[in-house]
Amino acid sequence: MKILHSNLIGNSDRHLFIIHGFLGMGDNWKSHAKKISDNNYTTHLIDLRNHGRSFWNDEFTFDIMVEDILNYANFHKIEKFSLLGHSMGGNVSMLFAQKYSDLLEKIIIVDIIPKKYKPHHNNIMD
């Protein structure tokens, strides 16, 4: 099992995973993460698969990215956390919340179009 790359800012028992948008990376949120960590959070700037310094794979769907986040949390032994998702990361975060709401304290969605897509859109990079 491959684990997503991340940079951590702050040192707290409260965790916030920041999930970037399409073609982005966790470091895009570094200045915000520094301010958030001042509010007693460890902020995880996560690079989704096929982005930043995370692994690359031909499988690239929202469902698989949700499982990548779950694997990341389990690997780091984080039982409860909050999610902030931007754009594509917002879609991934909402799907994560549908499947694993018991793991979440909060969910914050930034700048997405709330639309249900047809099934042929599920595989992002055909």
PLM regions with names:
Residues 11-13, 77-80, 101-102:
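Active-site acidic short loop of glycosyltransferases
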Residues 39, 100-103:
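Conserved dinucleotide-binding and phosphotransfer motif residues
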Residues 1-8:
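A short loop-to-beta-strand scaffold at the N-terminal edge of the catalytic core in hydrolase folds
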Residues 33, 73, 96-97:
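A conserved amphipathic alpha-helix that caps or lines the catalytic cleft of carbohydrate-
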Residues 85-89, 93:
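Gly/Ala-rich beta-loop-alpha elbow adjacent to hydrolase catalytic centers
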Residues 94-98, 105-126:
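Flexible "cap/lid" loop of the alpha/beta hydrolase fold
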Residues 42-84:
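Active-site loop/oxyanion-hole signature of alpha/beta-hydrolase fold enzymes
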Residues 8-55:
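Conserved HGGG/HGGXW glycine-rich cap/lid loop of the alpha/beta-hydrolase fold
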